[in-house]
Amino acid sequence: MIADKLFEKVEKNGVVCVGLDTSLDYIPEEFKSKFSNESDMLFAFNKEIIDATLDVSACFKVQIAYYEALGLKGLESYKNTLSYLREKNALIIADIKRGDIAATAKMYAKAHFEGDFESDFITLNPYMGMDSIDPYLPYIEKNEKGVFVLVRTSNKGAEDIEYLEAGHGKKVYDVVGEKLNTLGKNYLGKHGYSSIGGVVGCTHQEEAKEMRDKLDTMPFLIPGYGAQGGTAKDVAAYLKNGNGGIVNSSRKILLAYKAMEDSKNFAECARKEAISMRDSIREAILK
C-alpha cells in the first residue's frame, strides 16, 4: 500500500510536504534571466527546490492550477516536474481536487494515475457523494495509489458548508470524515494507516484530538501551516506519535529566500526553511 511508503518517508525524513505551487512571481529575477521561455524556467526552478529539499521532506504536493494557468507550456512544466520527482523516487501528491462521478471520474483517475501526469496521490472533493470516490478505488487496490479527500479545510469559507449541523450532534465534516475512515479500512497498510487520507487544516486546534481519535486510520494532509497562520503546536495535535500525517508548506518554503534576503541561493534557503519547519514540529510533538 502507498500508505506504508508515506509512513516510512515520514519516519525517515519528517512530516514536511513541500508544496510546488510555483507562481512565476516566486522565481527570483536573476534566475529568470537565464531562460527564454516560461516552461523551462518553471521546471528548472522546481528542480532546484526538489534537489535541495528531497532528503528533508516526506513528499511533494504539486498544485496543478499554477501550471494550467500557463496553458500548454505550463502543463509541460507540470509533466516534467512529475517525471523528475518519479526519477528521484519522491512521493507525489497531485493537488487537482477533482469531484465528478462515473465515467468522467474514471477519466480523471486514468489521467492522474497513469501516463504523463502520473502521481502517487491525488486530492479529491467529495461534495457529490461517495460515488465520486469509487472510480479511484481500483487504482488504490491494484496500482499502489492513494487519495486525500477534503474533510475539514483551513480556509475561512469552510464554515459555510463543512461546519453545518448534520444532525445527531455532528457537522458535515464529521460525517464526511467518518464515511471516508470506514471506507479506508478496506485499504489498510501494515502500519495501520489507509491509502484513503483526508485533507484536514491545522487552523482549528481545539478539534484536533477528537478528529485524530475518530479518524484513526486516516493519514492527514495538513494545510494551513505558515502563511495561513498554523503553527508547529497546531500541527502536532493532528499527528500521532509523530506520524499519521504530512504538513504542507508552499509559499513559506518557496519564498524563504525573501525572508533570508538571499535570492541567489533560493534553493538553499528553501532547504533551511524545510529543516526549520521539520524541527519545530518535532519539538512541538515532544512537549
From Swiss-Prot:
<dbReference type="InterPro" id="IPR011995">
    <property type="entry name" value="OMPdecase_type-2"/>
</dbReference>
<comment type="similarity">
    <text>Belongs to the OMP decarboxylase family. Type 2 subfamily.</text>
</comment>
<dbReference type="GO" id="GO:0006207">
    <property type="term" value="P:'de novo' pyrimidine nucleobase biosynthetic process"/>
</dbReference>
<feature type="active site" description="Proton donor">
    <location>
        <position position="97"/>
    </location>
</feature>
<keyword id="KW-0210">Decarboxylase</keyword>
<keyword id="KW-0456">Lyase</keyword>
<dbReference type="GO" id="GO:0044205">
    <property type="term" value="P:'de novo' UMP biosynthetic process"/>
</dbReference>
<dbReference type="InterPro" id="IPR001754">
    <property type="entry name" value="OMPdeCOase_dom"/>
</dbReference>
<dbReference type="InterPro" id="IPR011060">
    <property type="entry name" value="RibuloseP-bd_barrel"/>
</dbReference>
<protein>
    <recommendedName>
        <fullName>Orotidine 5'-phosphate decarboxylase</fullName>
        <ecNumber>4.1.1.23</ecNumber>
    </recommendedName>
</protein>
<keyword id="KW-0665">Pyrimidine biosynthesis</keyword>
<comment type="pathway">
    <text>Pyrimidine metabolism; UMP biosynthesis via de novo pathway; UMP from orotate: step 2/2.</text>
</comment>
<dbReference type="InterPro" id="IPR013785">
    <property type="entry name" value="Aldolase_TIM"/>
</dbReference>
<dbReference type="GO" id="GO:0004590">
    <property type="term" value="F:orotidine-5'-phosphate decarboxylase activity"/>
</dbReference>
<dbReference type="InterPro" id="IPR018089">
    <property type="entry name" value="OMPdecase_AS"/>
</dbReference>
<dbReference type="Pfam" id="PF00215">
    <property type="entry name" value="OMPdecase"/>
</dbReference>
